[in-house]
Amino acid sequence: MYDDSYVPGFEDSEAGSADSYTSRPSLDSDVSLEEDRESARREVESQAQQQLERAKHKPVAFAVRTNVSYCGVLDEECPVQGSGVNFEAKDFLHIKEKYSNDWWIGRLVKEGGDIAFIPSPQRLESIRLKQEQKARRSGNPSSLSDIGSRRSPPPSLAKQKQKQAEHIPPYDVVPSMRPVVLVGPSLKGYEVTDMMQKALFDFLKHRFDGRISITRVTADLSLAKRSVLNNPGKRTIIERSSARSSIAEVQSEIERIFELAKSLQLVVLDADTINHPAQLAKTSLAPIIVFVKVSSPKVLQRLIRSRGKSQMKHLTVQMMAYDKLVQCPPESFDVILDENQLEDACEHLAEYLEVYWRATHHPAPGPGLLGPPSAIPGLQNQQLLGERGEEHSPLERDSLMPSDEASESSRQAWTGSSQRSSRHLEEDYADAYHDLYQPHRQHTSGLPSANGHDPQDRLLAQDSEHNHNERNWQRNRPWPKDSY
């Protein structure tokens, strides 16, 4: 009687209870698995934090100059959240060691810059590809530099920019200390320019005693371009056309400068052949260009005339060189010494180099430097020195002239420019250089700043040269105190 009776919902509820009972172990397993993952993540992050702390006491392995912008705060894959570096294009990074294929450990070269995780070239390339895929899906197949712009360029222009961007590596390997190069007021090899620059060399030698290497370079460093060093065809042509210095000699000098910079001392080059910033613009040296400027062509003419007939014979060529320098936009130089007094110019330069010294020297002790950049995988293809031939043992050749020799005449060359007023000089040399002298070229551009982009869309963005110039250069003073 009771066997045939049916209680509605009995089997269903019983089956449901069984299902609930059997599903509990699965839920518990998922929770346990999630806890294991979280525990493993915390362990990995703890180890990464410890390695970050240990890196503070390690020496600098090598340095790079950035060609892209990157915001580490927005990168969720950083080994330690909040410990990623932020940098803009044309910034400089000191690399301490390799953490993984995607991450390095180092610091941004600036005062107070702390040790942080730096994306490797492979990591930046991965981010770039993801952004390109995202842009294509959104129907805007533009290059990274076009992200955030108001209007998309024509397809042909966009493809051209994208093709150009693909050939630009995210980093360029540069010396650990940017070498200082003096140019101006005119051509090297003539008395006025040589005496004024020698006065600065003597000052730097004494002011930074124990922290500076001043070395003479006779090879033509303008030949040290990546396109030349990595192209055997161009190398052969230049070796035929250049009687003064071969590519092998230039490459040897570049390696020697890199070697000098490993000590993290200030490196000053007395480069015979460098008279214009454009000569070093495409090299791997990333130099600090110091323009020794005479404010008026009339003053320079008077200084040249005061050196006698032997210098007067070359007045025209010296004035033409001066004219080319003063026409350069201010951002072509890192420091412009336009003071009338030697003491003021020396203090100006010393102030800049003191700030740079503090920017490059992290408070943590560093016993020295590691091997060359090629010791870290992934950098061989980005070396700016080209394929190495025979190994040359780098020699630190300090070719300073005796510090007291001709010091008085050097001082007179500086002070002579302020002996007479501009009014008297105009009267003496009216129209003497009127046809040759050209005023400064105005350097303007309407490109928007990369900082105006939405931070969610600019984890990695190609920066324009003008944006960097606007950020790092102040027109009122040739050298801003906050450059580093």
Curated annotation (Swiss-Prot):
Q: Where is the composition biased (Basic and acidic residues)?
A: 387-399, 423-438, 463-484
Q: Which CDD domains match?
A: SH3_CACNB3
Species of provenance:
Bos taurus
Cellular location(s): Cytoplasm
The gene for this chain is CACNB3
Q: Which residues form the SH3 domain?
A: 59-128
Q: Which InterPro entries match?
A: CAB1-4_N_A-dom, CACNB3_SH3, GK/Ca_channel_bsu, P-loop_NTPase, SH3-like_dom_sf, SH3_domain, VDCC_L_b3su, VDCC_L_bsu
Point to the regions of Polar residues compositional bias: 409-420
UniProt lineage: Eukaryota, Metazoa, Chordata, Craniata, Vertebrata
Q: What's an example GO cellular component term for this entry?
A: synapse
Q: Which GO terms describe its molecular function?
A: calcium channel regulator activity; high voltage-gated calcium channel activity
Write down which residues bear the modification named Phosphoserine.
152, 393
Alphabetically sorted, this entry's keywords are: Calcium, Calcium channel, Calcium transport, Cytoplasm, Ion channel, Ion transport, Phosphoprotein, SH3 domain, Transport, Voltage-gated channel
Q: What name is this protein filed under?
A: Voltage-dependent L-type calcium channel subunit beta-3
What is the similarity comment for this entry?
Belongs to the calcium channel beta subunit family.
User: What's this protein's function?
Assistant: Regulatory subunit of the voltage-gated calcium channel that gives rise to L-type calcium currents. Increases CACNA1B peak calcium current and shifts the voltage dependencies of channel activation and inactivation. Increases CACNA1C peak calcium current and shifts the voltage dependencies of channel activation and inactivation.
GO biological process annotations for this chain's record?
calcium ion transmembrane transport via high voltage-gated calcium channel; calcium ion transport; chemical synaptic transmission; positive regulation of high voltage-gated calcium channel activity
| Region: Disordered, residue numbers | 1-52, 129-170, 387-484
Q: Does the keyword Ion transport apply?
A: yes
Assembly, per entry: Component of a calcium channel complex consisting of a pore-forming alpha subunit (CACNA1C) and the ancillary subunits CACNB3 and CACNA2D1. The channel complex contains alpha, beta, gamma and delta subunits in a 1:1:1:1 ratio. Interacts with CACNA2D4. Interacts with FASLG. Interacts with CBARP; prevents the interaction of CACNB3 with the alpha subunit CACNA1C thereby negatively regulating the activity of the corresponding calcium channel.
